[in-house]
Amino acid sequence: AQGSIIRDLQNADMVLLGGDGKHKGNLINIYKKIQYGYKEPSIHLMSTKAAEITKIAVNCFLTTKISYANMIGQVLAQSNLYDEIETVLSSIGSDSRIGHKYMNFGFGFGGPCFPRDNRAFASYAQKVGVEHNIGTTTDNFNKAHLLFLKDYFINDNSDDLPFWFDYIAYKPGTDILTESQQYQLCLEFLDLGYKVYVSDDLLKDKCDARILFGVPDEKVYRIDL
């Protein structure tokens, strides 16, 4: 993942090796010679196409889980139970079949990988004849979730106070703005005339309001903590 690529490589849960032909079994021996991490991953050998499908299917499972957690959060918010969202999701994640990872309410998924893989899997599923696939639904919900957050935060801001973002990259620890819902929400608020405060150490050198947001500098305030 962006922001932790080396650490993730050294501590992978699994390694997918895809190959075709009678010598593909050699891939495992080759990998073991170069594997230098601190954790012994499970290694899975399969055809090239199966490995490609597996890779994007893993990310699609995560995007679906993110979207499902956000949907639960929306249901609770609409039920006047916003303060209990974290408690409910934590309770659901306590079930060992589900787990706590990605069971959080907040911004939808973004970045260069999740949206791309989600759409690729949805497109491929449709191509091979799987209709009404979850990938398409997840992608549509993720886009709609941004609008939900915008409306919710505006309705909750009756005093028209400035909005604060502690980061605007698609996730903490990177400076990547690709499909970042935080960044998109900043643009939405600025377009509506709100002031925005941004505190993002990794983006502070890039935080020129005219470049990032297309607005005068006095509309966006960079906060150094």
Placement of each model-derived feature along the sequence:
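Structural/interface elements that position substrates and couple domains in central-metabolism enzymes
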Residues: 1-225
